[in-house]
Amino acid sequence: MAFITINHHAPADNGAAFVAENATLAGSVRLEKNSSVWYGAVLRADTGRIAIGENSNVQDNAVLHTGPGLDVTVGSGTSVGHGAVVHGCTVGDGCLIGMHATILNGAVIGDGCLIAAGALVPENMQVPAGSLVIGVPGKVVRPVSAAQAAAIKANEEEYLELARAHAEAK
């Protein structure tokens, strides 16, 4: 893993369960307890801060990047899917950001949301808690169903187990 200090700001690991050896964390990045950062992911905080909450996972090849004056905050129990781009925005607790979804500057994703694979959340969009967002540009189409909420929680739990297994395999 590459932990890179930028302008005297170094990544901080506060008990992450797993950080892949080819993940890159640059600048003011903070990983909380039991979080995980997977293969090929890039967390680049050269113009702001990135915070990854407890039990959250940033999956393979995802990119998280700050913007000038724009931090990235990912709440607890949230999954950022493979190849997602999360830029200068806030993602609440218990969310699932689908594979190859993009969330742009200033967007705020409420707790318990599902952002569908490939969706584009435009700049400054405010997504109410418990919403399902689909499309390009992304639109709130309905509340997250009970089955989808259970799947979000199951994904969090699966990645906690996978993180432990991968950490032990080193």
Language model features with spans:
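C-terminal segments of enzyme domains that contribute to small-molecule binding surfaces
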Residues: 2-14, 70-72, 76-85, 93, ...
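Left-handed beta-helix
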Residues: 15, 20-21, 26-27, 32-33, ...
